[in-house]
């Protein structure tokens, strides 16, 4: 059995949309991180990516969390909320509660949680100020929920100003390109 069993859940950010391979598959930050982890360890790790593009935060939890935990991972990454922020009406506190649910289930199963915030596309989008405000609210709400939890790995991409520049984004300006996924990994 591998020392590391890493499972990723999320939406297009974790799936890898925007970083298409020549054969049409996508390769995102989670795939790159898993390979880097194996390379650093000097042996393979077990890895599964359950992420599905377009998913809202709570459906990610409802559809992906339990199947992911059934694999008995040592580490589980979660990102969500980016699609929720694009909706006309959304409650950031309710979305942040999804992160609390994942953390609780990880605690119950003895799984180390890797928490990611999405990269910030606000500067490139119409209604960017709304996206900026919602992303700031979601980030703050999630960080309050994991405050004092040194066991939670945090990869905070939202405040990374370099990552929000155009060089890291695909043509649609909603998804990161290969450079963006590599920076996050």
Model-derived segments and their meaning:
Residues 15, 56, 122:
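Flexible, glycine-rich phosphate/dinucleotide-binding loops
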Residues 1-53, 65-72:
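Serine-esterase "nucleophile elbow" of acetyl-processing enzymes
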Residues 26-27, 51-54, 88, 128-131:
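Short linear motifs at secondary-structure transitions and domain/linker junctions
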């Amino acid at each position: 059995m591998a020392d590391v069993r890493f499972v990723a859940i999320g939406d297009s950010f974790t799936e890898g949309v925007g970083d298409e391979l020549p054969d049409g598959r996508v390769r995102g930050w989670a795939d790159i991180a898993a390979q880097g982890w194996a390379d650093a360890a000097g042996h393979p790790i077990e890895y599964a990516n359950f992420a599905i593009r377009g998913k809202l935060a709570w459906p990610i939890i409802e559809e992906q969390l339990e199947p992911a935990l059934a694999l008995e991972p040592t580490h589980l990454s979660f990102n969500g909320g980016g699609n929720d922020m694009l909706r006309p009406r959304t409650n950031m506190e309710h979305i942040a509660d999804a992160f609390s649910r994942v953390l609780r289930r990880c605690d119950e199963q003895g799984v180390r949680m890797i928490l990611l915030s999405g990269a910030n596309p606000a500067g490139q989008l119409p209604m960017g100020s709304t996206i900026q405000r919602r992303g700031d609210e979601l980030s703050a709400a999630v960080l309050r929920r994991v405050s004092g939890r040194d066991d939670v790995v945090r990869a905070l991409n939202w405040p990374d100003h370099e990552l929000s520049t155009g060089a890291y984004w695909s043509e649609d300006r909603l998804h990161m390109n290969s450079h963006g996924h590599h920076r996050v990994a």
